[in-house]
């Protein structure tokens, strides 16, 4: 089976997406037929596999290529010889952050009826917004940390709204890769941390920061009616992974398995199933959990994990190919114009 990797995007995580695509190339190799790069101006470019390396993008060489136009059948390439349609195999949405995870690309691909692996519109909206993710989890009976949502209007009252003690962690409500994330240990650090977070999002989420909390990551997808899980990873970190650590982490080929009981692993999987069903059909996602006093809490849902979290799967290629055979289908609406014909008939 052949794939097309779509990456880049007008996002703070633009470079993360490039690194992610380069890493996935090393995993899937010649199964990737096309690499389609989306730049910050929403132009599409076809990138040769031989140019899929950091130096090429650092020098912005893709700007010398002719831009492509997305159509119902694939990508339209104009040249002096005339227009040519590049028919796309199954697309892997690997655009992190804005465009890829907020639902824009899902909307576009669904609109043009282009088959893709990735979160659909509703799944993107709920998982990209951390506050909405918490509401979604609560509705499913899954615990989340206490939290306060701030915007520019109420940020001046932050200390009155926060009902938990220092230290706490401040995050942009709609951003990933630890962009704009700070641990605040005393009040004098608050304004700077808020300024940093508001650079990336119009809203900011504040949660208690628990030093040394047990964290477990689990990736997976649903293939037909059965779930396919990765093994559970326990991130090796001190306070939290910053942007640079996550950025470099995508190149890894394997992650150490977590040492946890069968009972806890089953709990994580059951929570994953609740979160996935049926909202995330067609996507490989990663759920990050905390375990506090033997209780499982959802930290966040990553709808497009770095390099699709391939390093957590024992057989990623088979998982991807099986998922490709189990994608959700949007029913085609039949337009019969019967109402209009009836109006015409009655005239």
UniProtKB/Swiss-Prot annotation:
Coiled-coil portions: none
Localization in the cell: Cytoplasm
SUPFAM superfamilies, A to Z: Glutathione synthetase ATP-binding domain-like, PreATP-grasp domain
GO BP: any one term: peptidoglycan biosynthetic process
Residue stretches making up the ATP-grasp domain: 134-332
Residues the record lists as binding ATP: 161-216
Organism superkingdom: Bacteria
Entry keyword annotation includes Cytoplasm: yes
GO cellular component: cytoplasm
Main location: cytoplasm
Note accompanying the cofactor annotation: Binds 2 magnesium or manganese ions per subunit.
Residues where Mg(2+) 1 binds: 288, 300
InterPro entries for this protein: ATP-grasp, ATP_grasp_subdomain_1, D-Ala_lig_Van_CS, D_ala_D_ala, Dala_Dala_lig_C, Dala_Dala_lig_N, PreATP-grasp_dom_sf
GO molecular function terms listed in the Swiss-Prot or TrEMBL record: ATP binding; D-alanine-D-alanine ligase activity; metal ion binding
Catalytic reactions on record: 2 D-alanine + ATP = D-alanyl-D-alanine + ADP + phosphate + H(+)
Keyword NAD (UniProt): no
Listed pathway(s): Cell wall biogenesis; peptidoglycan biosynthesis
Residues that bind Mg(2+) 2: 300, 302
EC numbers, comma separated: 6.3.2.4
Function: Cell wall formation.
Family as reported in the entry's similarity comment: Belongs to the D-alanine--D-alanine ligase family.
Protein name from the UniProt record: D-alanine--D-alanine ligase
Native species: Helicobacter pylori (strain HPAG1)
Gene: ddl
């Amino acid at each position: 089976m052949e794939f097309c990797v779509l990456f880049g995007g007008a996002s703070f995580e633009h470079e993360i997406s490039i690194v992610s695509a380069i890493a996935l190339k090393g995993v899937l190799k010649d199964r990737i037929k096309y690499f389609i790069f989306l730049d910050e101006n929403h132009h599409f470019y076809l990138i040769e596999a031989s140019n899929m390396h950091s130096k090429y993008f650092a020098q912005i060489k893709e700007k010398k290529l002719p831009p492509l136009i997305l159509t119902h059948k694939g990508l339209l390439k104009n040249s002096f010889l005339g227009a040519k349609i590049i028919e796309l195999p199954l697309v892997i949405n690997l655009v992190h952050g804005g465009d890829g995870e907020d639902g824009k690309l899902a909307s576009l691909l669904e609109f043009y009826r282009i088959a893709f692996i990735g979160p659909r519109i509703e799944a993107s909206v709920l998982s990209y917004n951390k506050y909405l993710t918490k509401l979604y989890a609560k509705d499913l009976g899954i615990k989340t940390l206490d939290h306060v949502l701030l915007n520019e209007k109420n940020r001046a009252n932050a200390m009155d709204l926060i009902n938990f003690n220092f230290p706490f962690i401040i995050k942009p409500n709609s951003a990933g890769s630890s962009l704009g994330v700070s641990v605040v240990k005393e009040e004098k650090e608050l304004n700077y941390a808020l300024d940093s977070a508001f650079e990336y999002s119009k809203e900011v989420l504040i949660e208690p920061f628990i030093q040394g909390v047990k964290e477990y990551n689990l990736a997976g997808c649903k293939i037909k009616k059965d779930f396919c899980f990765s093994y559970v990873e326990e991130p090796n970190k001190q306070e939290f992974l910053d942007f640079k650590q996550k950025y470099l982490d995508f190149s890894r080929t394997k992650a150490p398995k977590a040492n946890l009981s069968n009972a806890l692993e089953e709990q994580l999987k059951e929570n994953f199933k609740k979160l996935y069903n049926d909202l995330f059909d067609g996507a490989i996602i990663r759920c990050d959990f905390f375990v506090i006093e033997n209780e499982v809490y959802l930290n966040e849902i990553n709808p497009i994990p770095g390099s699709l979290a391939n390093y957590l799967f024992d057989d990623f290629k088979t998982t991807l190919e099986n998922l490709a055979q189990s994608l959700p289908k949007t029913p085609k609406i039949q337009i019969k114009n019967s109402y209009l014909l009836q109006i015409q008939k009655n005239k």
